[in-house]
Amino acid sequence: MRRMAKYDRSYSMQDAHGPNGLARRGTQRGCSRSKSTRRGNLGTIASLTFSQKQALNLSWRLLKPQASACFRKIFLELEIASPKVKQIFYKAALVDAFNKDDDNTATLEVHIKLTTKFFDELLATLDDENEFVAKIRGIGSAHAILAKGSNFSSDIWERLGEIAMERVCSHEVVTKTREASRAWRTLIAILIDELRGGFEGELRQHRKSSSTDQIEMGKVEDEEELHSKLQQLRMDYNQTLPYT
């Protein structure tokens, strides 16, 4: 079973003090960075109530005009928390400076635009969990290529989740209603868990393919070495034959 993210989906959609709720002590902002103390009863999109889905869509419509500013703060905080991310964005900006034909999807500015578009598409799939999960994991797997060259690792997703949880859940649009606050906590927890799952799954495939290639290369090298040694033996043997 895949290891669970620190941002557990057990950010309950039930009242924190309800009979089945998860007792949590949040920050004054209405959203805590603290980890869940429970691993069971994971929230899923299917477990969101109709009113919570409505709250997500309504609050997103109100939040969207300010989304660019919100996501910019999230990514800038992530740069501070993870120098690897800052380096990736910096390199992308340098490349983009010399390429005016197309948008470089690795830059900070384009990430902000794509994240806004991503939430538009994601919230449209709340009633189709398979498509919802596939969309998120696809984004996660696309980042696996950064693991080798840029040392991108799973802990970056965790940091992103912590920052996003605090920034989004503390936004006045989200804190207006209890349903919206619960729903966004659940959404972000699932989002980070699936992003990391897609990333780690693709990374395992890369490593498996790399390992297989190394084994095959090793076989070829062994065969070439054996062939070379046989040739040398023949040469040595021929040199020892008496002249007739």
Swiss-Prot record:
The keyword Transmembrane helix does not apply. Residues 1-38 are annotated as: Disordered. Residues 47-200 form the Globin domain. Gene3D superfamilies: Globins. One of its GO terms (biological process) is response to hypoxia. The keyword Transport applies. This is Globin-like protein 9. The lineage of its organism: Eukaryota, Metazoa, Ecdysozoa, Nematoda, Chromadorea.
